[in-house]
Design a protein with these regions (language model features):
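A short, polar/charged loop-to-alpha-helix boundary motif
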Residues: 47-58
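Zinc-dependent deaminase
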Residues: 1-22, 83-154
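Generic structural signal for well-ordered alpha-helical scaffold segments
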Residues: 13-17, 60, 64-65
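Helix-adjacent hinge/juxtasegments
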Residues: 53, 61-94
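Short beta-strand scaffold segments in enzyme catalytic cores
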Residues: 27-35
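Short, basic and Ser/Thr-rich N-terminal targeting/leader segments
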Residues: 23-27, 73
């Protein structure tokens, strides 16, 4: 199973490099259902001026456009970075069952921040919380983030 996660995370890293090359934070995301990539997302909030163009949300939109709305609850979200609060809401709304990510984002992450949207059971309509696997290719994700911070004096 770890090899499978590594394969999809390598694809996310390639998407993150596309985001970085276009002036965006280096985030890439995939939605996978039954071994098939059903949605892809490249972070584009900065380049488009639309803050909702986070890689995870773009991947969900792409999966829906590809006809997979009813399968989202059975899909796995792969992403280079822990989903933020906004993306975590979308994940819970669509009941995506598993999330695999590289690096944590403790200030605004849906799993590690004090707002912990990904594990709350306080919203009954969200159902069961997703399984979360973190730290897959963390070092590579952190390097891309550092490259973005240096390029943008952050």
């Amino acid at each position: 199973m770890q090899k499978e996660h590594e394969n999809y995370m390598q694809q996310c890293l390639r998407l993150a490099k596309v985001a970085l090359a276009t002036g965006n934070p280096p985030v890439g995301a995939l939605l996978v259902y039954k071994g098939e990539v059903i949605g892809k997302g490249v972070e584009a909030g900065r380049s488009t001026g639309d803050v909702t163009n986070h890689a995870e949300i773009v991947a969900v939109r792409n999966a829906i456009d590809n006809g997979y709305l009813k399968q989202l609850h059975l899909a796995t979200m792969y992403t280079t970075h822990e989903p933020c609060l906004m993306c975590s809401y979308v994940i819970r709304h669509h009941k995506i069952s598993k999330i695999v990510y590289g690096t944590s984002v403790p200030l605004v992450g849906g799993a590690t921040s004090k707002f912990n949207i990904l594990s709350t059971q306080d919203v009954p309509k969200w159902g069961d919380k997703p399984t979360i696997i973190s730290g897959v290719y963390r070092a590579e994700c952190d390097l891309l983030s550092e490259e973005f911070r240096k390029a943008n004096n952050l």
